Amino acid sequence: MPTLQRRILDASWDPANVSKPLTAILFAIYTLAVTSVSSDDCQASFGETRGTLLTRYRAATVRALIATDFLTTREFEVLQAFFLFLLADPESELTSTLTGAAIRLGQKMGLHRENTHPKISFFEKEMRVRLWWQLHGLDSRSRAVSTPGMKLLPSEFGDVRLPLNINDADLHPDMTEPPIEHTSPTEMLCVLIKFEVFNWLRSSPTAAKVFEDIFQGPVRGKMSMELKDEVINKLEAIYQEKYFRNWDKRIPLHGLTHAMANLAVARMRFKVHHPRGRAAVSCGEVYMTREESDMLFDSAVISLEMVDVGIHSKFSSHLFTHMTSKFQIDAYIYVISDLRRRCSGDRVALAWKLVEYLYNEHPELIDDAENTFFVALGDLTLEAWEARRKELVRGQGVRESDVTPQFIQLLWDKRQNGNEESVQMPTVPDPHGLDSLGLTDENDLDWEYWNDFLRL
């Protein structure tokens, strides 16, 4: 909303005469602002808890939206406010339901069609394009949580072009022609790399089939591995050529978005090449070449590295949370399992550093001896470390005490103290543990799934 700042300043001088749509937008922005602030900062800045503020501003936004008849509206500003309200809690059941209503409203306004009407200014056209794609980005995120098996149809996006790669300062309500797009990253970088995936699916039937194969389960024998790799390589090339040719890693937005793009590509490669999604040759075994095995391991390590970069970023790390979930657990388990066979090299050293980060940030993995999944993961980690220890001590001549990480020592101490004997099978995982790793939504662990996963 490039013109919003001026309107907010005007409204502050005459709040009694602020229009209903703008009122809804303002309260939605207040709600979004609170969601981006930590609990401690809320208490320090406003003297109230984050929960109290969220309840207050959400209620105010709902009242403001109701005053605009937002579920039957044809006003563009009201739909903008509606979208911002939903964005404040993108993975909730309410958002999942209401996003469909918002998209239908957008269709009734014609947002899904390229509008060439001479009375609509370029500025208005660009705002309509941006909102349409934002609505579908939100819908995709909601589907991934609430209805992960629902098929995404490329036709849902209409024939609208992508938003331009320009900064808000390049836009003005009176301009009659579009500005020249930038060839370097802009303020739109983060959203454009997400929208590019949808544009990729819409423009390529093959890409749509590969995407469905990756995220909704493989259809065995229907598509060659070479074709899947070719399609993923194409998306990676689009990212590099269109958005990251002139990126600057010193700029936080550039660095975070680059990590998000790398994570998206690495996650696709991991899912495509993982043995669980491939046809077995005989006796349940999956044949993989050394090159494929290396690619799979590298993809898993890259994905975990990029998640670490995003989560520990000082710049809007919350943008990364929806890209983790159970996939992150899958990648960790695969990496740790493969480390039983991979003992040396830079990539192995990086993998162990990432495993160490995992245990340091989640001490319950060591302390909770009654959680069968944590115990099994610890046993797998110790088995992998034994192979690494032998390589370091015997192959490189270093002292064991100099290279043993603290988390490994703690795992050994836990085993030697016999705490593992108190484990009861099966148990329900702690609902408050491993929030960022996606275990909080599971009522029980699917042991058949994990046993199959570890059968490498």
Please provide the spans of the model-predicted regions.
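C-terminal transcriptional activation/regulatory domains of eukaryotic transcription factors
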Residues: 1-77, 82-93, 118-123, 181-184, ...
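Eukaryote-specific, cytoplasm-facing alpha-helical/coiled-coil scaffolding segments in long proteins
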Residues: 10-14, 55, 109, 129, ...
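Acidic, serine/threonine/proline-rich low-complexity intrinsically disordered regions
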Residues: 37-54, 91-99, 118-120, 148-160, ...
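C-terminal, low-complexity intrinsically disordered regions in eukaryotic proteins
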Residues: 166, 177-182, 191, 196, ...
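Hydrophobic core segments within long, regular secondary-structure runs in both alpha-
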Residues: 5, 26-30, 51-65, 82-86, ...
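Amphipathic alpha-helical protein-interaction segments enriched in hydrophobic
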Residues: 75-83, 126-129, 191-195, 252-274, ...
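Fungal transcription factor middle regulatory core
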Residues: 107, 112-234
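Alpha-helical junction/boundary sensor with strong preference for TPR arrays
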Residues: 65-68, 72, 106, 113, ...
